[in-house]
Amino acid sequence: EISCSLVGSEMCIRDRSSNIAVVVPSFQNNDRNYLIVSGEDFTLEFNKHNGYLCRYDVDGMQLMEDGSALTPNFWRAPTDNDFGAGLQHRYAAWKNPELKLTSLKHDIENEQAVVRAEYDMKSIGGKLFLTYTINNKGAVKVTQKMEADKSKKVSDMFRFGMQLRMPVTFNEIEYYGRGPGENYSDRNHAARIGKYRQTVEEQFYPYIRPQETGTKTDIRWWRLLNIGGNGLQFVADAPFSASALNYTIESLDDGAGKDQRHSPEVEKANFTNFCIDKAQTGLACVNSWGAIALEKYRLSYQDYEFSFIMNPVYHKLK
């Protein structure tokens, strides 16, 4: 029996079935471009130029799309409501906050590998900290922390979370949260909390014009799996929101002005684009098309911290 827990700021995995010695992860730092973390059945790579996790292999299974990275994400493809309120302009700084890596450190702590990356947010004026804690099973606790510059006046943001691209074969979803349809912080009272099994293809709603779609809220755990039942499970110490689509945020984004495209015109991506958020701004328009979300459903510029665990799900042949 193996249990995984996230309590406060600590991650631990306990194997109660044996007393086999723990194989502590190790670092390889002799590559000019990548910091490599390896264990008994897994390999992770961090790009030394931007600090991002860019490779995640477990038991020979590739969990990240080639050429991609786990990246901070503050933007969504604006909805019709967002356009009505002009949020594509008002929130524009969050589309590319110009993150600049200022520090990348690594160490072994409590028999776990720890990687810490620090960033300046040039267009926002704050600082971002990403911490990755990797245990002997290849599970990764990710902590995303932002310290706002209180002296600056900065707009609200669409979301606070991260984005991950997985190979297209990871197209099966299991989750415990609100469903079965898409739901948002100010549009979820009719969505029942329960356990759901769906496909990535089912997540996209073909609005007349492409826009944000597919998010689920109040999630306790979320799994993205392939046909063999292998993949990743995401858990956090508080309910979170998530989505998985065969479309990128960029492909659904009409930019500063509506392109008058239609959803069938958007080209599908050949991978699964997963977004995991501490929170996302509500859909708004309570009393008019141009109204922004109520204050309790908005994400103001302030300090934030979000932690979640990526736990490999795989059936090891003995």
Walk through the language-model features, giving the residues of each.
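Beta-strand/loop-rich accessory regions of lumenal/periplasmic or secreted enzymes
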Residues: 16-318
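Single conserved hydrophobic/aromatic residue that forms the stacking wall/gate
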Residues: 2-8, 12-15
